[in-house]
Amino acid sequence: LPASCTLPVQDGMIVRTESPEVQELRRSVMEMLIAEHPNGCLTCHRIDICGPSDICLRHVSVNDRCVTCPKNERCEFKDTVRYLGMELESPLAYEYKQIPLEIGDPFYDRDYNLCITCGRCVRVCEEVRGDDAIGFTQRSGRALVGTSFGDSLLESGCEFCGACLDVCPVGALVEKENKWEKARKIVSAICPHCPVGCSLNLEVNEKGSLIRVIPELNSSVNRGQACFKGKFGLGFVNSNARVTTPLIRRDNILQESTWDEALDLIASKLTEHKGSRSALIAAPDSTNEELYLAQKFARLAMETNNIDQSTNVIPELTIGLERALGYAAATNPVWDLEKSDCILVFNSNLTEQHNV
């Protein structure tokens, strides 16, 4: 049976992906992968009803049980074993690798005792991100994943984009923050940090707090990728210091008020500043819908056409773009840059503004 990644598509080709022969081949491959990972729970028929405090009839140690793994409810490896129906009577023996946990780097921990050496993290780092921060190494004749000289991720040049976490099918790579939290809802959102506007899926726990960020795989903007700010820099939404009630300054002191009182005060102040001598300036990170409402409010309520947004874009550049392209912004997808022979970057810090 030829592998799909090595056989070119031909006219009239009939592709069967669910035949008994294909499934049996998949099971044989998975048997080898299972031997690289704690498998007492993976091949047990009670896995769906077994709790963390239940007595294991297979005598699986606490550290090797699926219910104590931080990736238990989002483990692609476990889902694949279920899909293939691999309830093995005598799975291949798993030998604990005795690899110390890597917890010294920011943002995420690495437990290579759970690694199945599938190579996904290495490939996404090299082929998609172009970083080469991690690769295959050897230890006592065993192939492992790690940095070139055993250095930390910071020393290896890692960008901490989190792409390796998103493709890891097991619990070898896991976020430090909210490691054990389970998602109860997923909310679609746009990253607010830069003009690229990456599509993100926000995992929310039962208390309504953001616990994890997963880039949207099917987004035409970022294609399942994010930068360190989009992946790990949205925790501010959970801050207890966020202002949740209106504040009105009285005697030079900000005091809490009701929404009705605050809106009435704003309306009374705005009536004093109407017409062409007034202007409305909106935040550049507002959504299209918010900006539309802002301009509508300016024209109808404030009776002015003086509308702008505060931005760090140099006017000379935007004027030139508008004259040349008819639009003061990019008119083509970001991914067209892959086809460019020459890229001119002017007065921009790509790490800050277009890191993805």
Language-model-detected regions and their locations in the chain:
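Catalytic alpha/large subunits of respiratory electron-transfer oxidoreductases
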Residues: 38, 61-63, 118, 123, ...
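Ferredoxin-type iron-sulfur electron-transfer modules and their immediate structural context
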Residues: 1-161, 165-167, 171-174, 195-226, ...
